[in-house]
Amino acid sequence: MLERTLSILKPDVVKRNIAGQVNSYIENSGLKIIIQKMCLLTRYQAEKFYEIHKSQVFFVPLINFMISGPVVVQVLEGENAISLYREVMGATDPKKANSGTIRGDFAENIDANCVHGSDSLENAIREIRFFFSEYELLSLYEC
């Protein structure tokens, strides 16, 4: 099934100037990057985006990390994009991530683990709408 999913290249990727390499992993998997933009999240935006984790011990460090520098937010499209991108990302903990995955090859630790990807269709829709307006998504077809 053709799906869309949200990808975030986290501040460690931008800071280390490896966004191009990460994008190669995405594109080599067969996924298309249909829109992307770089932005600097405010604390409010980061807290709102990750509010599902608010009660977790890692919430504050996660928010501080996500606002520490620019991120690249992307919409990826392809067959079974959500599950495929989760495979391409690798396990959340890079120590458990397979070689050949983004986290297995690039992540420094569980906190600076390079990427975020939607984990369900429902979350993909919500997360894409969080970062991209209907106009931005519609304009993809109006060039």
UniProtKB/Swiss-Prot annotation:
One of its GO terms (biological process) is CTP biosynthetic process. Pfam families: NDK (PF00334). It catalyses: a 2'-deoxyribonucleoside 5'-diphosphate + ATP = a 2'-deoxyribonucleoside 5'-triphosphate + ADP; a ribonucleoside 5'-diphosphate + ATP = a ribonucleoside 5'-triphosphate + ADP. It is an enzyme of class 2 (transferase). The keyword Heme does not apply. Belongs to the NDK family. This is Nucleoside diphosphate kinase.
